Each structure stands twice: as C-alpha cells, then as structure tokens.
C-alpha cells in the first residue's frame, strides 16, 4: 500500500502508479513518525499532511474499517523532541513537564470539542482520541479537498500571492462566490458558538473546500469555551492579520465576536485580494481602506457588511 495516497499497488514497483510517491522516501520533517508506523495496533501512519507549533498531521490507514483517515499527533515544538526513526517523544527539559501535560489535556479537549459536531457537515469528524508514545493522537476523517487558501490560488492563477500584506495583492474571488463561502462558514460557526465554543484561529488555512463545493472547518487547536455572562482570562493565541484587538491580551474578554471579526477579514481578503490593516495597529492610527476603494465593483452595502 502506498503510504502517501493509501492506494494498493503491486510490490514490484518502487514508485506508486497513482500518485508517484517513491517507497522509502525520508520524511520531510525529521522528527515525524516514520511512514509505516502502526499506532494502537490499528492505524498505519503515512506521510505528513501538515505541521504546526503544536502538532503534526498525517495521512493514515484504518486497518479495521479499511478507510483512509487523518491522524493529528500532539507534538509541541520547543517542548519535546524525537530521535529520527523512533516512536517515543522526550521532553527537551524536565521543567517542561507541567506545561506539556496541560497542553496535552487541551489537545484531548480539542478532540472532545470536535466530536460534538460529528453530525454536522461543516466540521471535520473525529473518530477517536488515544494516548501512545508519550503523547496523544486524534483520529479523524480525511478530507478530500483543499484549503481555502489553496482554492483561491488555483482558481485565480494570474495574480501574485503574498502572505499577510496590506499593500500587495493576493488572489481574489467574485462577489457571489465570496459570499457563498462566508455564508457557509457563518452557518458552521453558529453551530459551534451555540455549544459555547470559539475557534480563535480562523483563516483561509483552516477552511477546507470539498470537491462538492461545501466547506469544513478544521484545526480547533486554539478553540476555547466561553460563558456569555462571565469574563475569563484566555491564553494569547492568534492568527496575525485575522485577530481582533482583544485577542492580543490574556485578560480581555473573548466570545463569538472574536470569530466574527476573523470572518470579516476573510471576506475582505476574498473580495479585494488584500488583508486589511491589523486590528492592533488601528488602535493607534486607523488607516482601514474600504473594500470598494480597492475593488470598484463592490457595492456600498457590502462595504458596511465587511467593516461592521
């Protein structure tokens, strides 16, 4: 079985005829689990799909259900390490133990938060959460599709892509398609906000566009529960360019409006191909440019919706 696309092919071939993956290719991330590793006597680990500051996500194969899945491993860089080719992780310092354990509990809480929405078409499905190799793993569905960031890039190939810049154009979509995507996103957010959960890390990287055109929200690693009648101190977790000013402070109150601000930024970016001025910078000098000043076809009413 190919450890990249998980298709079956004859043993005499070293190159997968379906995706071109070469058997025995070293992992791009040295500290990632070696392809072919079996977790919980059931899940065959494949190649890395993505990696961030708190975890590594792999494509995998469920030998019991015989389906392709995704597995997210708790791996906070800076706190832990792994000898290449081995399975257990080790702390980079003994003093890291409390922080690591607290983070792993938060990782497990992420799985529980996601599992609440397994009946929803707008949130990635979670099948299980297990602990092994000194860490934890979230077993979830493998989504056939692309991130919103990738989707915009592919559908508008003639424009330059530049990260987090308010002065240089990224790619953009039509008004109609931009509104369709944002409306679907708002529908999903209404569900998770109804359970008292805020995502806190919304961006085109965490929105998947499926082959049928629907969307799924992924990566709830920064998600937190909120109470409408209380003020709670929260850790500073934010996505630069998409975060409201209150997200820069541990003591500021955060609620569903934190996510709604990010939705406004995403809509602004889809319509104009640019990111607006960051919220924190606007506190000292508000230089926000209206979407219609960048893209003349945008009507005034849509300006009001975006900047509200």
PLM regions with names:
Residues 133-147, 151:
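Conserved short submotifs of the Hanks-type protein kinase catalytic core
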Residues 83-117:
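AlphaC helix of the eukaryotic protein kinase fold
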Residues 181-182:
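Activation segment signature within eukaryotic-like protein kinase domains
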Residues 241-308:
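C-terminal lobe helix-coil module of Hanks-type protein kinase domains
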Residues 185-197:
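Protein kinase catalytic-loop region centered on the HRD/HxD motif
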Residues 128-129:
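Activation-segment/catalytic-loop signature of the eukaryotic protein kinase fold
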Residues 148-173:
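AlphaC helix of the protein kinase catalytic domain
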